[in-house]
Amino acid sequence: YHKYLFRPRILVRNMYLRKGNLYNQADFYKSLNAFARAGVWQSTNIVVEEVKSKDSSNKLDLIVQLIPAKKFGYEASLEASYSASSNTNSVTAANAGNLLGVSGNISFLNRNLNKEGIKMTNSLLAGVEFNLKPDSNNRKNLINSNEISYTNNISFPRLIFPFAKFSSDKRFISTESFITTRLSYINRINLFNLQSFNFGV
């Protein structure tokens, strides 16, 4: 616990109980839920202890116990699909047939970017679709289409500009902002190529 893993403001932001204030059970559960919802700790607990001192009657100490989760995470997946088509449309017949699609996705997660509980996910997806059936001229394009895309998602545990001023308002129990960027390339053999860029807040 001597390691400087988090900036103090992330702790203050999730704590609804304040020094010198009257103890409130609702604020206790709000604080506990806020720490659990942050997603950067694998275990969260708040211990309430009565101060045992003659000159400190009716006072409580709150001990916040937080066990950090692993900062980095990885995830990989593989998917396959199959479809049979008897399309005779003159425009798309060249790509009709028995289609087998295979795609793979790998994601890298940073749960505590800049020591502020900011989560950033980088994902890379690649896929290819095979045509297992010859066309009407008995010609066969083995690869029907291919695709590759990259997605970056950043999740802030607070409101960001232009709504940042509302982050400190305790009426907002849960505030979160997202910035998502996506680049993709799709190649449909003999039909079209599509490059796209998406950005969202």
Q: Where do the model's predicted regions map?
A:
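Residues that define the transmembrane beta-barrel architecture of outer-membrane proteins
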Residues: N58, N98-V102, L142-Y150, N193-F197
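Sequence/structural signature of outer-membrane beta-barrel proteins
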Residues: K71, S81-N87, R111, G127-K133, ...
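Outer-membrane beta-barrel proteins
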Residues: P68, T92-A96, N110, N138-L142, ...
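Periplasmic polypeptide-binding modules associated with outer-membrane biogenesis and secretion
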Residues: Y1-V91, L125-A126, F130
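Short loop/turn motifs that connect adjacent beta-strands in outer-membrane beta-barrel proteins
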Residues: L113-M120, R158-E176, L191
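Outer-membrane beta-barrel translocator domains and adjoining extracellular loop/strand segments
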Residues: N87-V91, L132-N138, A164-D169, L191-S196
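Transmembrane beta-barrel strands of outer-membrane/channel proteins
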Residues: A76-Y82, G104-I106, N122-V128, Y150-N152, ...
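Structural signature of outer-membrane beta-barrel channels/translocons
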Residues: I67-A69, S107-L113, N153-L159, S184
